UniProtKB/Swiss-Prot annotation:
Organism: Caenorhabditis elegans
GO cellular component: chromatin; cohesin complex; MIS12/MIND type complex; nucleus
Function: Involved in chromosome cohesion during cell cycle and in DNA repair. Required for chromosome segregation during mitosis. Central component of cohesin complex. The cohesin complex is required for the cohesion of sister chromatids after DNA replication. The cohesin complex apparently forms a large proteinaceous ring within which sister chromatids can be trapped. At anaphase, the complex is cleaved and dissociates from chromatin, allowing sister chromatids to segregate.
Main location: nucleus
Name by which UniProt lists this protein: Structural maintenance of chromosomes protein 1
Gene3D superfamilies noted in UniProt: 1.20.1060.20, 3.30.70.1620, P-loop containing nucleotide triphosphate hydrolases
Disordered: annotated span: 965-994
Upper classification of the organism: Eukaryota, Metazoa, Ecdysozoa, Nematoda, Chromadorea
One example GO MF annotation: DNA binding
Localisation: Nucleus; Chromosome
Keyword Nucleus tagged: yes
GO terms under biological process: cell division; chromosome segregation; DNA repair; embryo development ending in birth or egg hatching; establishment of mitotic sister chromatid cohesion; mitotic sister chromatid cohesion; response to UV; response to X-ray
Amino acid sequence: MRGGSSLDSFPGKGTLHTLEIENFKSYKGKHTIGPFTRFTAIIGPNGSGKSNLMDAISFVLGEKPSSLRVRKYADLIHGAPINKPVAKKCRVTMNYKYSDGKVKAFTRGVNNGTSEHLLDGQTVTSAAYSQEMESINIFIKARNFLVYQGAIENIAMKTPKERTQLFEELSRSHEFQAEYERLKVEMTKAEDDTQHNMNKRRGIAQEKREAKMEKDEAEKYQTMKNELAAKSTMLFLHQLFHCERTIDESKEEINAQKKTIASLEATRSKEEAKIAAVHQEHRKALREVQKMTRKLDQKETDLAEKQQNMLTLKVSVAHEHKKLEIAKKMLAAAESKAENNSTQLADLKKSKKELEKKKAAYEAEIQDMMQRGELNLSDEQVREYGQLKDQAQRESAMVQRELLMAEQVFEGDKSSLNHELRRQKEHQERVKAKEGDVRRIETQIATLAQRIKETEEETKILKADLKKIENDVVIDKSAAAEYNKELVAVVRQLSEASGDSAEGERNQRRTEALEGLKKNFPESVYGRLVDLCQPSHKRFNIATTKILQKHMNSIVCDTEETAAKAIVYLKDHRYPPETFLPNDALVVNPLNEKLREIKKPAGVKLVFDVINPQHQAARKALQFVCGNALVCESQEDAKQLAYGGGELKDRFKAVSMDGTLFQQSGVMSGGSADLRQKSKKWDEKVVKQLREKRNQLNEKIADLQKHRRRELEVESVRSKINGNEQRLAMMKRDLKNMREMQLERLQNELEGMTAEMNMLPPRISNCQEKLERSESTLKSLQTKSNEVADRIFADFCTRVGIASIRDYENREMRIKQEMEDKLRSFDDDIQKLAYEIDFVTEQDGNRKVEVEKEKVSQIDRQYKDMKKKEKTAAAALKEHTESMEQDKEVLEEKKALSHKLETEWNEVKKIAQVAMKDFTKAEKELLRLESLLTKKQYERHSLLHSVKLGQIALPLKSGSMADVEYEEDDGDDTASQSSQSATDGPSVSEEQIQREQHIKINYDSLPREYKDVDDDDGVRQMSNRLNVEIDELQKNVSKMNAPNLKANQRMAEVKEREAESTEELENARKKAKRIRQQFEKVKTDRYRRFQDFFDPVANTIDDIYKQLSRNTSAQAFLGADNMEEPYLDGIQYNCVAPGKRFRPMDNLSGGEKTIAALALLFAVHGRNPAPFFVLDEIDAALDNTNIGKVASYICESAREHMQIIVISLKEEFYNKADSLIGIFPYPAACTTSGVLTFDLTRFKQIGLNEMTENPPTPSIAT
């Protein structure tokens, strides 16, 4: 840079001298920028690369790629953003000049995607490079040397905590932060340990006082424990003695019962073998029935699917047939149009050929005429004519030139008029053809719209049908769900009533007999008495069963004759005998009405009154069976009435609620257990009704299952609707395409043609007017030319014998013009016919016919394929139906076989049940004996376990208590609880029981009175007496706190721990004191380093803000929230602009925020100055007034304190710099920057006049 000011005398350690950039971002190749002056401004248009120069400075000073607006180092190479890097590396070198003139080169580059650092050309580590930077007071983390674009306002808007962090980094007090926090944690922990040890010592003193109290209780406690042990030993000996005696007796009975069971087992096995054989055959027959049923169900499903498929094929055939008819209509229309086009094309070609012949004949006629020539001149006259013509042209040269131009204009206007007329005619024909296309498309649109309407109507009908079918399906499903719900309830009721188990053979036969009687005598046989009535409440079931006991299953009929016929029927069919109650033969006594008025005893009712007849025919039979029998609440009441102790003093037949019957004769009968079983007959009646309802529900559900084909029909209709909707969508898309694309395009083209044609008449009128004007001009010039020619050719015309030379020339010209017009007319007509031929040829009707023929052929093939599939499906449906009928016949045969085998199986099973009953009875007795044995063995184990658990010393003859294992459950020392556990049957292995058999107890010490007890009650009473004595002793023991028998040992341990806790407390106090001293030292160092930096900044910031504002009324304040430890809390920064009241920082204007941020930056920089300061567009938010203030301050600072480099776009700012660096872009695919340097110091000295006389030339950085 020429004339650049020197910085050799610049105060401080040194300055940024020059910057060398090679292939960095937009700087292609190598550039040397500088030398930099005290105040250097970098200018240039947006996008030229100014910020890239800022990035280059930041890069060489150690910034990371993320701060340089790239993701990785390789993106810094020129061309990398467009994937065309110019090299594999880039480099930036900062030549730093010390105050003694020495220059050090700081170089940082990118090589193969990694960063490298060099000092004076020597490669160094990143740490060494940063250390060298810090030696010249450049700290990259604190960024005390640069401000990025847009960051100036963020500096002012930092939060107090962020401002504190900034001061921590600048003051380097954060270097003490880790040690500070570590010591603070250790100090807190040491103080907590000290407090813990102090509390521990207090607890040990309390424990020492308690140890003495324990010793005094030990002896008293031990005396009572000894007495309790003696009583417990006596109790367990007593219980074990009687337990072992019962075990020996049970073993003898078990051996005898096993012999009986062996004999019964052989009989049972033989009968079960017979049952198994018949049952196997029955199950096989059932499986065949189920298999055939499933097969029929599947075939029924397949039949529904085939019927649905048949329906779908029929619909498809009809659809294809309709498509075929439409396609044939379209083919006929295309053939008709193609035929018309062929006829029209032949006529046009014929007309064109005739015109061409006429034109050729006319051209021959013209040639012949020209050869004849009506006016012939001699050669001499022709030469003379030529000479005179040349003379006339020379004398009228100016006029001839004007005449020639006028003729050209006239011919041009005439040609334009003819051209516009031809265009008008062509447009009229094209508009006519386009109107035909529009009409054709409109016809197609109308046809397609009609098809859409028909399809929509069909779809609407199908949707209505679908809705109806779906409603039917929903109703069926709802009904099925209700039936299933009812079925579940019925099955649950059957399960609860135990009525769903298999009926006995006898009951089943009797049920079949009654059903047969009802079928043969439907009007005469009413049913069993138990089925024809029902107790009014369940609590009367047992009492009414007792009264009706003999006749509960009797059959009620109308007459004795019917009863006789029914008995014959039963004998013929070998059914069990039945009891009949014919209404006409029953002798019924009237009811005693006084019995309904009995008050005492309370609750007495006639049995007849508590039974509700459910059939009118049952009333007489019910009255016959019940008579005047009474039902009472209790046995005492029934007994009182039966023995004449009631209000009426008469004897009556009475039954209590529990079924005890008292006769007038004094006979009493009970049998409550048997009555309870018989009373279930009432439940059996309900069960029977439930079974019937279950069967009805199963039949209904099965019928609904057969309606599943309706669901398939739903799917079929839905598929047809989907097909229609898809076709509708396609047709609507085609209709939309025709309307919006084809018709709209044709209409637009027609409108364009019409508009263009409407523009032609004015243009034709304009051409006619221009032609008239050019013709008038031509005639005027022609008159002037004729005057000259008449004068020159006057003698020649007289000699030749013509009135004027123009008569000769006009005749020749007229003939020539007429011939040319005639020929042009022929050409126009031929061209018009050629255009029409081309237009008709473009219609290509035959191609449309071929397309329609192919479409008809394709649809016809599809139609035939569908018909073939329909025929095949019909044959398959017929075959499937015939196969189903055959399978149904087979199913009926298999059902009959299954029923026969079931009857045989029931007969065999009845015989086996008797043997099974005897075997089961013997087995139950054996189980009872074994259970008693096991119970007593477990009881013995439980007693031994309790002895071992309670550490009770039993006298043993042999064995050891070690054979008794501990159980993993809670126990008690008392015999009563041990007995309870034995009763519950604890989980003990057989091996454990056998092992305990080796334990033989010595009962010599057991008194005789305890051994002589024979029954369980006596044993229980003796045990209870001992338990009472033991409980009393235990209560006395439990009232005492169990003493610690090792009290002396505990006292010694307490004293030893007391000494240890005293020592630990002293050590903790010393440690806490030492750590606190260390913490206070680190705290002081951190505080001093922070305050040494913060105080000068806080003291100078107000002056700097006043200087920037150029007003002494401006105020800036910087203060810490925490005065004792300012680095722990925030730092407040507030500014009061000149002439304004105090406002928070975020309420200041953009310019005021910028001035405040600059004041803070310059104050911080003044405390920890870097050798130079780089600012990127800090004036963005400043107006011209503030720019002037900031620029003046920077100029003063640059002369006195620091080197400043500023990127700016505002002339008011950069015109005060000492030098300018201009950045400009080169035109290229990738942004490429160029650099200019310009020295302004000489102009500050020589002034503007010299600059005007000798304008300087900027130097280009290389």
